[in-house]
Amino acid sequence: GASRITLNSAMIRFMYDLIFSVHGYSTYEAGVALRTAMRAADYKGAYSFRMQAGMGDTIFAPFYEVLKKRGVRFEFFHKVENIGLDAAKKNVETIEIAVQATLKQGIAEYNPLFDVKGLPCWPSTPLYEQLEQGQALKDQGINLESYWTPWQNAGRKTLQRGRDFDIVIQGIPLGAMPVIAKELIAASAAWQNMVENVKTTGTQAFQLWFYPDLAGLGWPFWMEEPPIAGPYLRPFGNWADMSDLITRESWPDSNSPNNIAYSCGPIEQLNPYDWNFKDHNAPRTALDAVRKSVLNFLGAPSQFWWPAANTEAGFSWDLLVDEKNGNGAARLDSQYLRANINPPDLYILTAKDSSKYRLKTDQTGFENLLITGDWIDNGMFVGCVEGAVIAGKQTARAVLKQDFEIFGEKDRI
């Protein structure tokens, strides 16, 4: 086997940390790891690209606008709760949906985007003024994306095969399958094997806004390319300087940042078969755990990245931008912390001997069901944008019944 020095080298650690391969499933399937490393050397243009705005604004808003212009109908605030099969267990027969909110009278369709400095952006909360229940959602601080929300749905719908759909393209991530696809799992050994063997993990992240720029924080290589660094101490083993996004944000001149730091890492997950969505405090408990992790990181560990932000007394909290001008660690309340524990938010791992259990887009075992996403057998077997794009193309190929090559789904040699 490899020596301890090799196992703890930057390259090996980077490969494991990049796909959050830690906790109880700290393995990385050897063939996939080797192929991914080789594919990384096959990049086009650059090894990685920096988005010029948030991912929702750079990727999903344009996707939405293009699809909208092409006639796709969107139904927002509709949550899939169950995928039902026909009596023969061969087709998806019904899709049960919870209607979380409805549009105000006179509004024909929900417009999800709002303008920030001329850029169509996704908001962090619903645009309440368009919703009949908008004021109640706002007053109660409801997060409709949370599976633990106490919110009472506005209604229900059941989509019926032959009336509402013919083909189903299932793009909801694997983490939600134990919740919404119980009938599929019970009817198919292949689905049961996929759900049991393709593991997931929750993730945690922070975004910090600093008054000083990168040089002021003490990073010694500030004159070079803004850093994307890793691996480092878990769980926050990576750091991306995203200060180029400041121009996309709206800050008062008297209280604006000069540096933005992003980091993310794994978090202990819940067993999907034991989820109890009646515990409405679960998201707060998870977020408190993230806050504790960030507080720990901003102690001694952060000194390596931001030496000038630390003194003998500890982290210099007054360097964090805070419009409320809080004291000490209270300034963390004005930063962005996130615990990704919702079933669809769980990251897909590439544990040893797991890829063989992934299903291809058109080999679900059900005649009218296709699946897509970075969690299927798309040829990459790694949770990433590239895998999701390849899977989307594979699904389109299956729907169109065409035969065309998709770059990345197969080895080039």
Regions found by a protein language model. Give the residues of each.
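Short, conserved active-site loop motifs that form the nucleotide-linked donor/cofactor pocket
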Residues: 72-73, 369
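Short, glycine/acidic-rich hinge or "gate" loops at secondary-structure transitions
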Residues: 76-77, 404-413
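A conserved short coil-to-beta-strand element within the FAD-binding core of flavoproteins
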Residues: 76-103, 135, 139-143
